[in-house]
Amino acid sequence: YEPISWDSAFGIIAEQLSELDNPDEAIFYTSGRTSNEAAFLWQLLARRLGTNNLPDCSNMCHESSGVALGDSIGIGKGTVKLEDFSKADLILVVGQNPGSNHPRMLSALKAAKVAGASVVSINPLFETGMRRFKHPQDPLEVIGQGTTIADMHVPVNVNGDLALFRGLSKSIISGSGIDYNFISKYTSGYDEYERAVADSSWDEIVSASGVARHDIEKLAAAMRASSSTIVCWAMGLTQHHNSVATIQEIANTLLLGGHIGRPGAGLCPVRGHSNVQGDRTVGINHKPSRGFLDSLRNTTGIESPFNHGYDSVNSVLAMLDGRAKVFLSMGGNFVSAMSDTDSTSRAIQSCDLSVQISTKPNRSHLVTGKTALILPCLGRTERDVTSEGYQFVSVENSMGVVHSSQGSSKPASKHLKSEPAIVAGMAVALDGKIGDSGVSWSKLSVDYDSIRNLIESAVPGFDSYNERVREPQGFYLPNPPRDDRCFNTDTGRANFRVHPITATSPDDGQFVMMTIRSHDQYNTTIYGLDDRYRGIKEARRVVMMCKEDMNRLGIKTGTLVDLTSHFEGDELTAHRWRVVEYDIPAGNIATYFPEANCLVPLNSVAEGSNTPTSKSVCVTVRTTEENMRFWNRTATQAA
């Protein structure tokens, strides 16, 4: 790399974009840390060019949640407010590790416990943060025993959750936990679902879930007794072939008891990035609705294409086969975050141009297109001062609260630009190549109130945006299922959706591998080699395996193994992983993300959401020594 001026960088980008044979040869990727203001301008720039190629990190994580809930309850978001936790009788935490990935949520769970709620952990791993919590800002807790969080742990098989919740529904329907008034007034499809549940055998449920019937019925009894139940989940549910079906099964179970649209109850997908939900709200969507595009045209004058664009997986495929030639990334570390690291790297390297808008160096700066640009931007913690004064941005959290974010630190360099200013600079340069868009990009780059005015006009729910976002706690966006028990679905009601019980079925000799994050890690950013809550030190290339499986394979803690994933006849191999004994169900193993992404097949995706199946990878395990002997024998025979 060598330094160039901002004008030169914007000129290179505009030149490449203007010379494309088709606007769909450009891809505009978005990281979930991008603010509402920058994200709105980013999608506006893409659609001004003429493409809906707007993949984002949600495609890799909670896309399954959005697809499932949009069809079931009419909104691709959760239905819970933060204050609902202290009003709940029962909280199920499924496929989630809040201790490491959502630490502030532990405070909400602690408050719920103090208020009398029961908390149940449903996870192949019983994570330390779910056992006991010491609030770091409470001196008495730090020196004391802390608060016990989980009253019960259910060690479900990897991808056994659909079967588990089918079992819960079966027990609830046979008991007394059904809110027939709610079902009659607000739902559709109950009779068909009831028949499907009746046809599901306990043998099938127990086999697929890995949970004994009496444990399922024990949890179901707690659900029947609960007046207000919350179910939380994260990527432990969203990255399987059947993730959409699994999340809809959870929705079915809550609909039975009417646990949507009342205090202390609801569905709660817990997202990781600070604004992954807000980015989607303001238009980062490769499958935009016609209504949104019409509203965007009426607000900005931009005529958007109506055809759907590429998501993250399809972006890689498009780059690999030459259908996409320019990759622009608003934040993030796409090469490390995506599945099938080798294929993703080759895809980026095939591009004529790759552009990274970043706050710090990452792997994606080293795996690049033929021409590569790094555009350094202000971080959220840095002061953003323009000719119009001190600016702030806004984000939306997992509960649907939009609030402001304003940096106070001195910028690392006087040459840094804000994300909105960078997008506007690219847009002005592009206008100079392909004609005036009619958008006042320069004004938008210095006055973020004017961006928020556009969002208010284009996106429902942002009335009086600039006034309300300045309130200390921000404001809630409308959520019809939560606020009014209004369900904007195809039936006008909340839908019971029926799916067969499915699970990941490895061949003989294979394991089901899930990828997880460590405590000293935030998404693809790794701060240290220790995973303190799991007792793993100075190592990340590890395989967590139960003692039973280790004994069966004749290996010990510390043994080096090679992992090979299998999908539709294709194999991906990664060498020299160190085995660690861990409490995980037999037949399942766990490895760290992003190191194990190289084993996640690119074409192995969730039905309906196209999310990589990073939690359901069928792998074989061979000792590295055994593999070396095998290859030596093969080479000798060939000679």
Residue ranges and their predicted role:
Residues 468-547, 551-608, 616, 621-639:
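Long, compositionally biased stretches
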